[in-house]
Regions:
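Sec-dependent N-terminal signal peptides of Gram-positive bacterial secreted proteins and lipoproteins
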Residues: 1-27
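Post-signal peptide N-terminal regions of Sec-secreted extracellular proteins
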Residues: 27-132
Length: 132
C-alpha cells in the first residue's frame, strides 16, 4: 500500500471518529443529585440548554416527601422551570420524566431536591436531569 493511500485512510478514520465523538458528547449532557439523610437540600451541577427532562426516586426510608425542582438562570436570576413532589417510596422513571418549560434561549439548569417543610432532613432521594 502506498504511503499516500495509508495517510488518506488514517485521516478519513480520524475525521469519522472525531465527528462521531462530538455527536455523542453534545447529546450526553446529564447530571444527578443525591439527597442524603443529613441534608436539608441538595442540588446537581449545571447543565446547559433550552429545556430539560428530570426524574428520580424518593426512598421508602425517607421520613418526608421531597420536592424535585428544575431551576434555570435568566439575567443572573434563578427561576423554577418545573417541579413535582414525590412521597416517600415513590419514583418517576426516565421513561415518564417530567419536561421543563421550553425557553427561547440556552442557559444553565440544575435540579434541586428539597424535603417538604422548612429545614427538614432525614430523606434519602436521587434525582436526574438530562438534555432532550
Amino acid at each position: 500500500m502506498s504511503k499516500k493511500k495509508l495517510v488518506s485512510i488514517l485521516l478519513s478514520a480520524v475525521l469519522c471518529f472525531g465527528m462521531l465523538g462530538s455527536t455523542f458528547s453534545a447529546s450526553a449532557a446529564y447530571v444527578s443529585v443525591h439527597l442524603t439523610k443529613n441534608q436539608a437540600v441538595n442540588s446537581s451541577s449545571n447543565v446547559y440548554g433550552t429545556f430539560k427532562y428530570f426524574w428520580g426516586t424518593n426512598s421508602k426510608s425517607s421520613k418526608h416527601s421531597v420536592y424535585y425542582i428544575a431551576r434555570y438562570k435568566h439575567n443572573g436570576v434563578w427561576y423554577t422551570g418545573g417541579s413535582t413532589l414525590l412521597a416517600a417510596g415513590r419514583e418517576i422513571d426516565e421513561a415518564h420524566a417530567i419536561k421543563t418549560e421550553r425557553l427561547d434561549y440556552e442557559t444553565d439548569w440544575f435540579l434541586k431536591l428539597n424535603p417538604k417543610g422548612a429545614g427538614t432532613k432525614d430523606c434519602d432521594a436521587w434525582g436526574y436531569m438530562k438534555n432532550a
